[in-house]
Amino acid sequence: MQTSHIDELAASGVWFSRGYAANATCAPSRASIMTGKYATRFGYEFTPVPDPARFILTWLAEEDDAELKGRIDREVANNLPSYFDMGMPTEQITIAEVLKDAGYYTAHIGKWHLGITNGMDPQSQGFVDSLSLAGSSYLSENDPEVVNAKFDTSIDKMVWSTSQYAARFNGSKPFAPDKYVTDYYTDEALKVIENNQNRPFFLYLRHWAIHN
């Protein structure tokens, strides 16, 4: 297979030969980026999972498909606090808080996953503006831009067909972007750079596409 465009990008881009992460899972790794600490040191070693997702994961653990087989501690799963009560401890100081106090304009774009209530949301953690990804980030199942490719597994209908657009600005009502979410968030990030080029700013851009 010829991959001339990818080869050209690789030849003219930056090559990262080593990558490091402070945690093996999503949210704790993000907490480490925000605080400069190992998340396990302040009690945030697990990724908060929305209530419906807990049911899905438990269901998958019972599937016969070996590729989806997992292990679920039912006692723990059934006694977790609400998703809305979980997040990075608010006493932790983020880089956004430090830079905001130093006079920087601070903006968050993309996924957050460090809490959405009780002072754990982006704006309470040092960001002046936040264009977030709330929940899933999928198009509607019947969107004309979607090429439907169904799989013979029960999770396909459960997740794909029930997930909707989830862009949200400063905690407002979720809305549908006018383009693919990766393009949308990239374009909005470029606007932040353009609009703030003459003053100190900090942009935290977290795309969803490379996550899953």
Region locations from a protein language model:
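Surface-exposed patches in mature extracellular/periplasmic domains of secreted proteins
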Residues: S17-A22, E45-T47, I109
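Active-site nucleophile/metal-coordination loop of metallo-enzymes that catalyze phosphate/sulfate
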Residues: A21-Y44
